[in-house]
């Protein structure tokens, strides 16, 4: 198994430009899909790129990482229907205005277009698109993933004005019942993403993060106890 130590990637001009273009779009983003999420995806994507046995266009990958979720704030407020479709188009226009070569723009757009785990998302065909997908999904695993997914539950609950899930375990003998998901939804969401990973380095990193989530949930169940009194 590879050793995943600290890896600092030096951003190239395309990645730096994309960051400058992307950051203002995240001003109204909620924590699960803000510029810090984009930054983590960027860093993990480049980390994975250094461990694949393929030549990776790191500029394309870095740019796509910064731009992939710029439509999230607008989708959340129903200003647009699909953040992926919107971000793909918007990114193309932004990069074209900066004189970026058409081939690079199309490569970045493919990464953005295929980064979602939604059933409607097309398959990632290039190594850059696969690495972006993997890095994005890994951000929903491990300690970061527990935090992000809890944020997403809060976001969805606020948007629907109904509890999306509760911080409890409905397998326990409770005096209350509910038809929402319980805390195990964190594990379910993470597993769906781990099973979809494309690259070997991502799968190895995902296995480590999965172990942490098992430890977290075990501690959670221990803390609430069967009757929630411990």
Question: Which residues fall in each region the model found?
Answer:
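Short amphipathic alpha-helical interaction patches enriched in hydrophobic/aromatic residues
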Residues: 26-29, 49, 70-75, 95, ...
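An active-site-proximal "capping" alpha-helix that borders the catalytic cofactor pocket
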Residues: 41-42, 46, 82-96
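Divalent metal-dependent phosphate-bond-processing catalytic cores, especially two-metal-ion Mg2+/Mn2+ enzymes
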Residues: 2-9, 29-35, 40-54, 67, ...
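His-Asp-centered metal-binding catalytic motifs of divalent-metal-dependent phosphohydrolases/nucleases
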Residues: 58-77, 83, 87, 91, ...
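Hydrophobic, well-structured mid-protein blocks that either form specific transmembrane helices
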Residues: 94-130
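Short alpha-helical hairpin
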Residues: 6-23
């Amino acid at each position: 198994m590879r050793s995943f130590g600290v890896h600092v990637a030096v951003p190239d001009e395309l990645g730096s430009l994309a960051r400058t273009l992307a950051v203002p779009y995240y001003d109204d983003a909620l924590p699960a899909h803000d510029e810090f999420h984009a930054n983590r995806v960027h860093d993990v994507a480049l980390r994975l790129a250094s461990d694949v046995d393929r030549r990776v266009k790191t500029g394309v990958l870095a740019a796509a990482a910064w731009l992939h979720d710029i439509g999230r704030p607008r989708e959340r407020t129903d200003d647009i229907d699909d953040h992926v479709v919107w971000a793909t188009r918007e990114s193309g226009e932004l990069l074209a205005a900066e004189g970026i070569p058409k081939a690079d723009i199309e490569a970045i757009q493919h990464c953005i277009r295929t980064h979602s785990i939604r059933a409607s998302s097309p398959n990632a065909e290039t190594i850059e698109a696969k690495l972006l997908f993997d890095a994005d999904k890994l951000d929903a695993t491990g300690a970061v993933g527990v935090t992000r997914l809890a944020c997403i539950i809060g976001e969805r609950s606020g948007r629907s004005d109904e509890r999306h899930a509760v911080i409890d375990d409905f397998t326990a003998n409770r005096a209350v019942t509910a038809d929402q998901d319980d805390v195990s939804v964190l594990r379910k969401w993470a597993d769906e993403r781990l099973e979809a990973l494309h690259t070997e380095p991502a799968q190895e990193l995902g296995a480590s993060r999965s172990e942490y989530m098992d430890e977290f949930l075990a501690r959670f169940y221990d803390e609430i106890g069967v009757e929630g009194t411990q």
